[in-house]
Amino acid sequence: MILDAKNLAMPPRLLPVSFTIDAGEIVHFIGPNGSGKSTAISMLSGLFEGQGEITFMGQLLSDYDLPSLARMRCYLSQQDRPAFSVAVYHYLALSLSALNNPRVDHVQHALDEICQALNITDKLNRNIQTLSGGEWQRVRLAAACLQVWPAINPEATLLILDEPAAALDIGQEAAMYKLIRRMAEQGIAVVMANHDLNRTLREADKVLLLNNGSCVVKGSPSDVMTVEQLESTFATQVQRIEHEGRSCLIFND
């Protein structure tokens, strides 16, 4: 276990919720808009104060200084664009600033792998202000993964993503989830707020379903994402079908 959250809360946006996160685990927070997903995962970053207690790698999260946190975890908030103009490669280099002198060849190998996975290799010399929304989001994802890539940052343990698929098309989204699974296979725990319930059903190891600031249920995708619980939480009709050995959710008006 790398993280233990007890009675995490920021009333009224988030009421007390407790959960644990293991190394290499992919955890999805799902729920309607305003349910508390972003609030919950933002508190795991150590940048926002609230109620409750978070133990991270055996130590209270509040006891870490920011440079230590920057080496151990990365937090990608919802899409924003800085007010300065730099090339993409320069922006990506900023994600390495907190690391302890990683080897140049290891950094280059990690950069090549991540950029190829997200199909942004041809964007490295572009100015970030000239990128489309989807291109910019992929650059942000690349920077986040680079910061906690184990081969160049052995202290890394946690990647926190707030709605990372925003602005991505279906092919780019598929590539992102493949990269997230690659991170998890290297032992990085990935925590994310997500709206694509079919992706959560397929990709998550653990799910927390939130509504009106409260955790309705938590557990495996099959236990949490029942038709009854989804219909009650999202106030819409839901069907769950099997297609080619895979469960799919269909939402009816």
UniProtKB/Swiss-Prot annotation:
Residues 3-237 form the ABC transporter domain. This is Vitamin B12 import ATP-binding protein BtuD. Keywords: ATP-binding, Cell inner membrane, Cell membrane, Membrane, Nucleotide-binding, Translocase, Transport. It comes from Photobacterium profundum (strain SS9). ATP binds at residues 31-38. GO terms for cellular component: plasma membrane. The complex is composed of two ATP-binding proteins (BtuD), two transmembrane proteins (BtuC) and a solute-binding protein (BtuF). The gene is btuD. Part of the ABC transporter complex BtuCDF involved in vitamin B12 import. Responsible for energy coupling to the transport system. The keyword rRNA processing does not apply. Its EC number is 7.6.2.8. Gene3D superfamilies: P-loop containing nucleotide triphosphate hydrolases. Its main location: membrane. One of its GO terms (molecular function) is ABC-type vitamin B12 transporter activity.
